[in-house]
Amino acid sequence: QTKRKLNEMKELMLLLLVWIGNNSTLEVERVFLPEVKLVSSAELHERFGIEETCDGIKIKALYNRDNKIIYLHEDWNEYNLLDRSFLLHELIHHRQKESEYACRQEMEEEAYELQFKYLKENAINNPKEALNINDVFYIILTTCAAVE
């Protein structure tokens, strides 16, 4: 079942890469698909470096730039729009590694804004609310720290 899910995910990733190419300046031609692993909530939180019991933060997906692997929560469902948007977000990070950014937060801002656009195009009027992201958390995630 998991192997079938991962094979079907490849088709979805190709469709999402086309969407990324049509909605951003990120390079999507001649792109290899990253490996995808379905992992437990505990492993996602460990890879992110926070306690699984940390209130309000539920990690659903991560991209590791070093090994080029997308990690998705083991209950990821290709038919769930929010889950597809998590995969889209991590595919954006996969493509961002080829570009220059001032800071990691700038990459997050681009990924979130594209994810929000994708959700709006699919009838989610308030993507931040659907993703359980409040304005303060969004600012923290997407604002580069001042460098002196």
What do the predicted segments below correspond to?
Residues 85-98:
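Active-site recognition of the HExxH zinc-binding catalytic motif
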Residues 5-71, 124, 131:
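Auxiliary, metal-adjacent structural segments of Zn-dependent hydrolase domains
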Residues 103-140:
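Post-HExxH zinc-binding segment in Zn-dependent metallohydrolases
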Residues 2, 73-77, 97-102:
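Second-shell loop/turn segments in exported
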Residues 71-87:
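Short pre-active-site segment immediately N-terminal to the catalytic Zn-binding motif
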Residues 56-58, 80-85, 106:
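Short, surface-exposed coil-to-beta transition loops
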Residues 53-55, 104, 143-145:
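Sequence contexts marking disulfide-bonded cysteines in secreted/extracellular proteins
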